[in-house]
Regions:
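A conserved helix-loop-beta module that forms one wall/lid of the active-site cleft
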Residues: 92-154
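Short, charged, surface-exposed secondary-structure boundary motifs
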Residues: 39-41, 55-57, 100-106, 219-221
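Internal nucleotide-binding/catalytic subdomain
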Residues: 158-240
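General beta-strand structural signal in soluble alpha/beta enzymes
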Residues: 5, 30-31, 69-70, 91-94, ...
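ATP-binding N-terminal substructure of ATP-dependent carboxylate-amine bond-forming enzymes
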Residues: 1-96
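Short acidic-hydrophobic, aromatic-tinged amphipathic segments that line or gate anion-handling sites
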Residues: 45-51, 123-127, 158
Length: 240
């Protein structure tokens, strides 16, 4: 079996390493991979960008790849799974529509509200003044989120009106996150520990996997700005 892993981070290195442990896997390719995956047995990096879907399809077809596993959110939101499936290629990941739950915070929050799934109160804004007035009305602390993908850095916890105003202006007027910040979701600040419960679904069946806890703050003690993730561990003790 030949496997393609799409992405360049530690997540993709871990996926590639695990796939390479199976006897039935003869070769794992990572597009584009990183310095760590380049050193592993049975693993080869290829110089194809993770968002270059036509080039990825061409590689899969030319190398007779048995299954592709997608790591990053961006190609999923672009519809890589749909395009692979249209070509009859095996790929693991959510469809373009399902990926909007990750790709658009407004889409996700609206989905939760529409289906009566508990979530923090929120509003969506495209203009700065109404957004700032909403913050004044709701009080602090409050959470300002760029609607789209921002490499895990599009969430600001504002403890003062000045911080909230700066974040809103930065996203909506300053174009800090480009198209991803053309809308902002302003959300209630919830206290407590955050954890993820990961399941696989196919539309009919649910397969529970594992719990995980991501740590995004840059500095020790959960301080500093959010990053794409300083580290994570699984299972998460906070989930019983």
């Amino acid at each position: 079996m030949k496997v393609l892993i799409i992405g360049s981070g530690g997540r993709e290195h871990a996926l590639a390493w695990q796939c390479a442990q199976f006897d039935e896997v003869v070769q794992v390719f990572v597009a584009p991979g990183n310095a760590g995956s380049a050193l592993e047995n049975k693993i080869s990096n290829i110089q194809v960008d993770s968002e270059d879907i036509p080039a990825l399809i061409k590689f899969v077809q030319s190398e007779s790849i048995d299954i592709t596993i997608v790591g990053p959110e961006a190609p999923l939101v672009m519809g890589i799974v749909d395009e692979f499936q249209d070509k009859g290629l095996s790929i693991f990941g959510p469809s373009k529509l399902a990926s909007q739950l990750e790709g658009s915070k407004a889409f996700c929050k609206d989905f939760l509200a529409r289906n009566n799934i508990p979530t923090a109160f929120y509003e969506v804004f495209t203009e700065t003044l109404p957004a700032i007035e909403y913050v004044k009305k709701k009080g602090l602390p409050i959470v300002i989120k760029a609607d789209g993908l921002a490499a895990g850095k599009g969430v600001i916890i504002a403890n003062t009106l000045s911080e909230a105003t700066h974040a809103i202006n930065d996203m909506l007027d300053g174009n800090r996150f480009g198209e991803a910040g053309s809308r902002v979701v302003i959300e209630e600040f919830l206290r407590g520990e955050e954890a993820s419960f990961i399941v696989m679904v196919d539309g009919n069946n649910i397969l529970p996997m594992a719990t995980s806890q991501d740590h995004k703050a840059r500095d020790n003690g959960d301080k500093g700005p959010n990053t794409g993730g300083m580290g994570a561990y699984s299972p998460a003790p906070v989930v019983s």
